Structures are given as structure tokens and as C-alpha cells.
């Protein structure tokens, strides 16, 4: 009986811990790099609370979970955070900027891309359709007199790893990639080079800082946990 009681208490504690854990989601890539430290803190016992951190390949996997209240917090692209704020009428709010400029144009096997203008007539591989990478790329192309719908061909992939795989099989490939994928791809293929830093290109044409990722929280959770 005593053993059974201890087992029951242990199970209850486990359920309570799971229930009380802060449910966080992040995307594989730069928007979540700042959250990785939470895992090591939890493992070594220095975290101030329990965390349940889940990583996803695409932002559209996270959105419905936030909307249904199955997540408390998430690291997502900045433009998506703005959309969710509007859709939920403030029910999901940004609490911190976690990622600034981390996007680059990478070229394989050449040095033909020296400026945004050089992208005209080329095919560009990219992640992030409907999120920050797409909007940044389209904004910069337009700002440099290039129609993103007519003057270039943009092929979108759901994850950065798919872009790097496609680059490996494409001669003279050009891609928009975030860190740390730029570095990882370069280590696997020494013919890749960083052609353009999109933060630098942004600063040439915009008077605002390029913010690519933010951390959002459900308003209800924030009100229940003000600390």
C-alpha cells in the first residue's frame, strides 16, 4: 500500500509538473537559438521553472497551437507575430525581439552577385514563404527596381535544410538563407560564398531596424504569470 501510495504521488507530481511547465515552441533556426539555453538550464537544475520546448520546421505548424491555447509562448517571425496580434485582437502579444538581421544571399560556384541588381533574371531559392524572409526579399528587390514577380524566379521551400539540399544539386545556385545554415552549408561545400548581407542591404534603403524574429506570449498566460 505504501509503495502504491508513493507511486500515485509520483504520478501526480509528474502530471503537475507537466501541467505547470511553460509550453514554448520555436522554429528550427535562428529564431530559436536564444531559447536553446533553457534546455541546458533545465538539465543542470538552474532554471527557475519547468519548460516544455518543442521545435518545428515551419511557422504554420505553430500558429494553430497558439490559437488553440496549446502553447504559452513561441519564437516566430516578426511579421507573423503582427498578423497573430491582429487575428486574436491582442490575445497573442510580442514580449521580446529575439532575432535581428540573420539573412544572407549565398551563391554557389561563382561571384556574379555583387549587388541586389545582379539578382535580376536569376532563380532564387528561399525559405519562409509568407514569413519574414519572403517579405524582406521582396521589399529589397522592389527597393532596387526589381519586380519580384516578373524579374526573378523565387522558389520557396519549407525548411532551410531543403534549400541547402537543393543548392547541392543545382549548378550556379543562388539562395536566401539564415544563419546558422549559411555557415553549415559552407562547411559542406567550399564553393559557396556569402554574396550579400541582407541586413546591410536593408540599411541602405530603410530607416528602420531589420527585425526578423520575436517572442510572443498568450495574453491570458502573461496575465496569470506576471513575473
Regions found by a protein language model. Name each.
Residues 21-22, 26-61, 65-67, 84-87, ...:
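Short, polar/charged alpha-helical segment
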Residues 15, 108-124, 219-226:
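Flexible hinge/capping segments at coil-to-helix
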Residues 1-16:
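Short, low-complexity, disordered segments immediately C-terminal to signal peptides
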Residues 53-65, 77-79, 148-169, 180:
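Short helix-initiation/N-cap motifs at beta->coil->alpha
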Residues 13-30, 49-55, 93, 121-126, ...:
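Short, well-ordered beta-strand elements
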Residues 94-114, 208-219:
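Hydrophobic/proline-rich hinge and linker segments of small-molecule sensing/allosteric domains
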Residues 24-28, 121-132, 144, 149, ...:
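Short beta-strand->loop
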Residues 79-80, 160-227:
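Pocket-lining segment of extracytoplasmic ligand-binding domains
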Amino acid at each position: 500500500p505504501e509503495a502504491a501510495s508513493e507511486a500515485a504521488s509520483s504520478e501526480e507530481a509528474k502530471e503537475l509538473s507537466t501541467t505547470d511547465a511553460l509550453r514554448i515552441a520555436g522554429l528550427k533556426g535562428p529564431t530559436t537559438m536564444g531559447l536553446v539555453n533553457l534546455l541546458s538550464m533545465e538539465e543542470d537544475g538552474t532554471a527557475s521553472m519547468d519548460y516544455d520546448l518543442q521545435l518545428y520546421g515551419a511557422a504554420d505548424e505553430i500558429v494553430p497551437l497558439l490559437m488553440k491555447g496549446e502553447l504559452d509562448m513561441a519564437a516566430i517571425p516578426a511579421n507573423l507575430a503582427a498578423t497573430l496580434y491582429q487575428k486574436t485582437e491582442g490575445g497573442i502579444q510580442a514580449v521580446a525581439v529575439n532575432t535581428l538581421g540573420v539573412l544572407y544571399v549565398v551563391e554557389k560556384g561563382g561571384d556574379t552577385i555583387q549587388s541586389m541588381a545582379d539578382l535580376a533574371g536569376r532563380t532564387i531559392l528561399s525559405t519562409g514563404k509568407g514569413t519574414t524572409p519572403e517579405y524582406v526579399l521582396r521589399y529589397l528587390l522592389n527597393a532596387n527596381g526589381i519586380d519580384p514577380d516578373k524579374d526573378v524566379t523565387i522558389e520557396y521551400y519549407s525548411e532551410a535544410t531543403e534549400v541547402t539540399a537543393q543548392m547541392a544539386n543545382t549548378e550556379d545556385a543562388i539562395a536566401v538563407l539564415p544563419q546558422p545554415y549559411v555557415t553549415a552549408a559552407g562547411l559542406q561545400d567550399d564553393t559557396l560564398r556569402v554574396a550579400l548581407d541582407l541586413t546591410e542591404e536593408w540599411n541602405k534603403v530603410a530607416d528602420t531596424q531589420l527585425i526578423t524574429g520575436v517572442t510572443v506570449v498568450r495574453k491570458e498566460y502573461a496575465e496569470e504569470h506576471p513575473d
